[in-house]
């Protein structure tokens, strides 16, 4: 009645739906000025899975939500730690001890109440991979930090024909301008990228879009007290404690955040403007259906 006085319930519902749509369009209007209405609708219909909601993945999720992506799947079994505050957008004094996926979900819904958010308190590895149906995803983001998990993620995405982008090493670096988007086989310098190239080659995976840095990794100060390896301050119930880690990389607020934002930009472009360009560039096929 408030919206459309004097009309029936069905018409009132239509008016309410229109008001919601108008508020949504207004919320993302600045993005629509660049992408257009059709692409904004594509983003609203898209489902993106982000594996790893830390320094990189947290910023990716934030940017995707602010870009209007309609459905987000968040995968991470970790809790926010005091040591995350220096670099993770989800980490504040008030969120320490909370599950990262829960904090990220609250942020997303505060940004866009109409978003659909699925959370998984799961450490993605080969033994947990069957929990995820990749056929539901329009895009997959790899922001996890274990080689075994990253390889499995790439294999699973490739097997389902789902686009994937992978973050290479962001720790022990100070130059955010040194990061580039490239195919994994065209990377250099980054130690993690080197391992990934070797392992993907073994598995005959020929392509993988990554974000990597040409900056030589710095050597962190070996101080047991600073690194928490002597007296871990991880919250109760944390899965991977500092005392159990071989090494803890140094980090800043301005490096992993840039990686996460670059990844989000690639996802948005691939789901919208790049998608259209690829369709226009599709090669003609022969009468038998094969490519020339």
PLM features per residue range, with description:
Residues 21-49:
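N-terminal charged helix/coil linker that caps or initiates catalytic domains
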Residues 22, 132-136, 144, 149, ...:
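Glycine-rich phosphate/adenylate-binding loop
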Residues 51-52, 75:
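Conserved N-terminal Rossmann-fold NAD(P)-binding element of oxidoreductases
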Residues 56:
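Hydrophobic/small residue at the entry helix of a nucleotide-binding pocket
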Residues 66-71:
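Conserved S-adenosyl-L-methionine
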């Amino acid at each position: 009645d408030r919206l459309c006085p004097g009309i029936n319930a069905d018409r009132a519902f239509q008016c309410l739906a229109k008001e919601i749509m108008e508020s949504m369009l207004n919320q993302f209007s600045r993005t629509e000025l660049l992408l257009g209405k059709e692409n904004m609708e594509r983003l609203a219909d898209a489902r993106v899975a982000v594996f790893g909601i830390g320094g990189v993945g947290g910023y990716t999720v934030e940017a995707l939500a602010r870009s209007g992506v309609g459905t987000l799947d968040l995968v991470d079994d970790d809790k926010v730690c005091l040591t995350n505050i220096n670099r993770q957008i989800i980490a504040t004094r008030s969120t320490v001890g909370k599950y990262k996926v829960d904090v990220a979900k609250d942020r997303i819904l505060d940004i866009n109440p109409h978003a659909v958010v699925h959370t998984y308190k799961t450490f993605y590895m080969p033994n947990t991979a069957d929990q995820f149906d990749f056929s539901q995803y329009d895009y997959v983001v790899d922001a996890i930090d274990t080689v075994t998990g990253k390889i499995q993620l790439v294999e699973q995405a490739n097997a389902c024909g789902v686009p994937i982008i992978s973050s290479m090493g962001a720790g022990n670096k100070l130059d955010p301008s040194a990061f580039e988007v490239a195919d994994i086989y065209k990377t250099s310098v980054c130690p993690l990228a080197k391992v990934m190239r070797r392992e993907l080659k073994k598995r005959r995976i020929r392509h993988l879009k990554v974000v990597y840095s040409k900056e030589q990794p710095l050597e962190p100060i070996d101080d047991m007290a600073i690194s928490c390896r002597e007296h871990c301050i991880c919250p109760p119930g944390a899965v991977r404690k500092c005392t159990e880690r071989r090494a803890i990389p140094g980090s800043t607020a301005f490096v992993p955040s840039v990686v996460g934002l670059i990844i989000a930009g690639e996802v948005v472009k691939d789901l919208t403007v790049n998608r259209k360009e690829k369709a226009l560039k599709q090669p003609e096929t022969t009468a038998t259906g094969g490519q020339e």
